[in-house]
From Swiss-Prot:
CDD domains: LPLAT_MGAT-like
GO cellular component: endoplasmic reticulum; endoplasmic reticulum membrane; lipid droplet; membrane
Membrane-side (Cytoplasmic) residue stretches: 1-71, 208-215, 311-418
Gene that this polypeptide is encoded by: DGA1
Record-level Gene Ontology MF annotations: 2-acylglycerol O-acyltransferase activity; diacylglycerol O-acyltransferase activity
EC code(s) of this entry: 2.3.1.20, 2.3.1.22
UniProt protein name: Diacylglycerol O-acyltransferase 1
Enzyme type, top EC level: transferase
Pathway(s) it belongs to: Glycerolipid metabolism; triacylglycerol biosynthesis
Length: 418
């Protein structure tokens, strides 16, 4: 970890803070003792967030801190509610509901999806932190065609704080009940690459309206899929469902698609998170054919590759060898718990040197061309699966190489390693 506190390249991407340039060395050798003492302190101060940080940037940092720690906070609150007799009148009925409700695994996310919740200001702050941008390369045919009086209506609000120079801009979107709309087009299965640490871009682009998803792809309601273990935390699972996030199990994915709700799957999974590196992009894709089978078993669906430039720049990941003790522990954890824990670091809440908050690295989520799967086949043969898998990889590579120079990685190669 000797490079932990010396990652100057990373720190230059941070904040654009007023402290930039604070470590410039004075060439004048006749410095006074006071100047020398100040110069000694400057490298230490560089890592701290300045008090002059704009209020809006503080809100962005808090939004990201909430997202990265929300599952822990919900867990703590649940334990507090269970251990507090005064709250049992609420905790007991909820826990009964929690044990019997199967919404995350039965496609019921369609009924729990809330555009109003996805449009809360916190998600705009979250996306502006990096920032995250959602870019479409072609227009996608809407699954639902909305009449003008059914379109998303946006209202803007401004709340003045004290002192008056601070204010919070709020946006509120009207809700749309797609269940009462006529389906006029295909559904979509978006494959998101690369996984990175936490798929931060996928959350901002497809689980919230922070990137204006409903305006960029109108009439295509979407559910981001994640590990079923995330729904084992009380309250947190309802929070995820309100954002349209659901379990990535095959049964749930098929049921969600059958209800004309498109889905987004982070294809590389837990194993790919171990490959996160700023030196290039490595994907786990050759053996990932389950999502292709889902599309064929659904029919009238488009496979759409999505590449997020900058996803792997949000954290520094310490590489481990497969034969090392740590590498074996990571693989064991993945095999037994369904996910793994990469060794990573970035910045903290009040400093830029070390912590678990991601860096402010731009994430450009570029959506490729759709690959239409017309015919529904309940048990697709291998040659059909391989055919669409090859088409998908070809489109993903085209998407990457046509856009890599535009988004700052002109020489980085795309490697499919597993």
């Amino acid at each position: 970890m000797s490079g932990t506190f010396n990652d100057i390249r990373r720190r230059k991407k941070e904040e654009g803070s007023p402290t930039a340039g604070i470590t410039e060395r004075h060439e004048n050798k006749s410095l006074s003792s006071i100047d020398k003492r100040e110069q000694t302190l400057k490298p230490q101060l560089e890592s701290c967030c300045p008090l002059a940080t704009p209020f809006e940037r503080r809100l962005q940092t808090l939004a990201v801190a909430w997202h990265t720690s929300s599952f822990v906070l919900f867990s703590i609150f649940t334990l507090f509610a269970i251990s507090t007799p005064a709250l049992w009148v609420l905790a007991i009925p909820y826990m009964i509901y929690f044990f019997f409700d199967r919404s995350p695994a039965t496609g019921e996310v369609v009924n729990r999806y809330s555009l109003r919740f996805r449009s809360l200001p916190i998600w705009k702050w979250y996306c502006d932190y990096f920032p995250i941008s959602l870019i479409k390369t072609v227009n996608l045919k809407p699954t639902f065609t909305l009449s003008k009086n059914k379109r998303v209506n946006e209202k803007n609000y401004k709340i003045r704080l004290w002192p008056t120079k601070y204010s919070i801009n709020l946006k509120s979107n009207s809700t749309i009940d797609y269940r009462n709309q006529e389906c006029t087009g295909p559904t979509y299965l978006f494959g998101y690459h690369p996984h990175g640490i936490g798929a931060l871009g996928a959350f901002g682009a497809f689980a919230t309206e922070g990137c204006n998803y409903s305006k960029i792809f109108p009439g295509i309601p979407i559910s981001l899929m994640t590990l079923v273990t995330q729904f084992h935390i009380p309250l947190y699972r309802d929070y995820l469902l309100a954002l349209g996030i659901s379990s990535v199990s095959r049964k749930n994915a098929l049921r969600t698609l059958s209800k004309n709700q498109s889905i987004c799957i982070v294809v590389g999974g837990a194993r790919e998170s171990l490959l996160s590196s700023t030196n290039g992009t490595q994907l786990i894709l050759n053996k990932r054919k389950g999502f292709i089978k889902l599309a064929i078993q659904t029919g009238n669906i488009n496979l759409v590759p999505v590449f997020a430039f900058g996803e792997v720049d949000c954290y520094n990941v310490l590489s481990t060898k497969k034969d090392s003790v740590l590498g074996k522990m990571q693989l064991w954890f993945k095999e037994n718990f369904g996910f793994t824990i990469p060794i990573f670091y970035a910045r903290g809440l009040f400093n830029y040197d070390f912590g678990l908050l991601p860096f402010r690295a731009p994430i450009n989520v570029v959506v490729g061309r759709p690959i239409y799967v017309e015919k529904k086949i309940t048990n697709p043969p291998d040659d059909v699966v391989n055919h669409f898998h090859d088409l998908y990889i070809a489109e993903l590579k085209r998407l990457y190489y046509e856009n890599r120079e535009k988004y700052g990685v002109p020489d980085a190669e795309l490697k499919i390693v597993g």
